Amino acid sequence: MTNPFLNLTYEPALESLGNEFFDPVSAATFPEHKLRFRNDRLLPMLGLEPSQVKDDNFVEAFGLFHGVRPFLALRYHGYQFGEYNPNLGDGRGFLYGQVRGVNGELFDFGTKGSGQTPYSRGGDGRLTLKGGVREVLAAEALHRLGVKTSRCLSLVETGDSLWRGDEPSPTRASVMIRFSRSHIRFGTFERLHYHHQTEQIAQLLDHVIVTYYPEVSGSNSDDSAHIAFFRVLVERVAKLVAQWMAAGFCHGVLNTDNMSITGESFDYGPYGFVPTYDLNFIAAYFDYGGRYRFGNQPAVCRWNLERLQVSLSSVIPSKAMTEALEDYEKIYLGYYITLIARRLGISSTLGDRLDPELWEKLVGQTLQCLAQSQWSYPDFFAQLRLNFSPSWRDNADLILENVDLLGADWSTWRSIYQQVLKQLPPESLAAVPTVLEQANPLTDLLRPRIETVWQAIAEDDNWQPFNDLVQKLQSGN
């Protein structure tokens, strides 16, 4: 039987731009190939029926790396913790291939942990198994929370033993396939700007617009398309950060080389979900100054856009980009309020019917109470989903009556929430439970849960807790 992955039509979209953007590389060979995760939910997007794709097909394509060539290690630079670093590039992965989904969109298969490249900088090019497990879990959790994100297509344990300073060593190794819209980063353009490659900047930008920004690719002139692209990118990034903040997600390392040009979450290795609403929460243990703390994500992503503005200034008028950036905070705040309101059961379609000041007041009071009380951030929204009753509209004292509301002015919050519910027409009030269910998963992905899953794997090679958690994260239960 032929391998469905090897029969896909791979497009040389990025490869066709020329070898200025990548280096051809080979995959490492591994002593073992154990499939630990396969994401059957992604297969229909590729026109594949999960029942027709065997585990061995995943291993052959994404563990043994048979059948597809060339593999491309992409070149890029980046600002890391605010300092420019020209010594970057794909150091432990490559672009495996690009395929069209059934919806006509182009998707990347990118590896992580597939061996050394010219950009490994002395590293072994490998991925720890724990790192792979963590990314699988985060991607599925973010997707269920409605956050635009890359996903993991497969995770193969390789049998290698790795030494890491931040993990008990030796530790197990893996190779992962990341499924995303693109692996072109802000840092891809920054590298071209650093080398004064104006023609290549224009070439890559036109490729990005045609491939990932069809809504602006039909503009009457290159200038108008380029300006429109940057405006849409600013909007995408602002909304993405709003999604992170509403989800309680801290990326961890928002260097410009970890920012996708499509406005999609990826490369969030040291991520963390906030246990409580704490703007000073830091996900990465090495973020000593708190540059990438939870509450600083909106500001640092705007800073990253400003760095990209410099790199694109040879192609896009700087004034036009500055004007686009002036809308960043407004877009972010408006979308963030909408998302928090949704987590409170109020859908965006109802927003036009509500008093906007009351809506903002509810969101503000909610966040203030969560910060003061230090109630578990995911548990608060889960309790709303589990306990909501239409009777709350008529009696504020009934709102979360079975939950101890301590440590903050919850009585004021109850009063405001009741006022909002009173504004809803009957059909909208009836829809609140559905909105709450869609917006608020019952299973969190806080660090203790991840560590429990990992300990079962590390100590007993027991993958059942991991599989159970993936299923819960995907379903929202």
Curated annotation (Swiss-Prot):
Residue sites binding ATP per the record: G89, G91, R92, K112, D124, G125, R178, R185, D267
MF terms (GO), sorted A to Z: AMPylase activity; ATP binding; magnesium ion binding
Reactions that this protein is recorded to catalyse: L-seryl-[protein] + ATP = 3-O-(5'-adenylyl)-L-seryl-[protein] + diphosphate; L-threonyl-[protein] + ATP = 3-O-(5'-adenylyl)-L-threonyl-[protein] + diphosphate; L-tyrosyl-[protein] + ATP = O-(5'-adenylyl)-L-tyrosyl-[protein] + diphosphate; L-histidyl-[protein] + UTP = N(tele)-(5'-uridylyl)-L-histidyl-[protein] + diphosphate
Protein known as: Protein nucleotidyltransferase YdiU
Enzyme class: transferase
Family membership: Belongs to the SELO family.
PANTHER family, per the entry: PROTEIN ADENYLYLTRANSFERASE SELO, MITOCHONDRIAL (PTHR32057:SF14)
Documented EC number(s): 2.7.7.-, 2.7.7.108
Location of the active site: D257
Positions of Mg(2+) binding: N258, D267
Cofactor dependence: Mg(2+); Mn(2+)
Alphabetic keyword roster: ATP-binding, Magnesium, Manganese, Metal-binding, Nucleotide-binding, Nucleotidyltransferase, Transferase
Regions crossing the membrane: none
Origin: domain of life: Bacteria
Annotated function: Nucleotidyltransferase involved in the post-translational modification of proteins. It can catalyze the addition of adenosine monophosphate (AMP) or uridine monophosphate (UMP) to a protein, resulting in modifications known as AMPylation and UMPylation.
InterPro entries according to UniProt: SelO
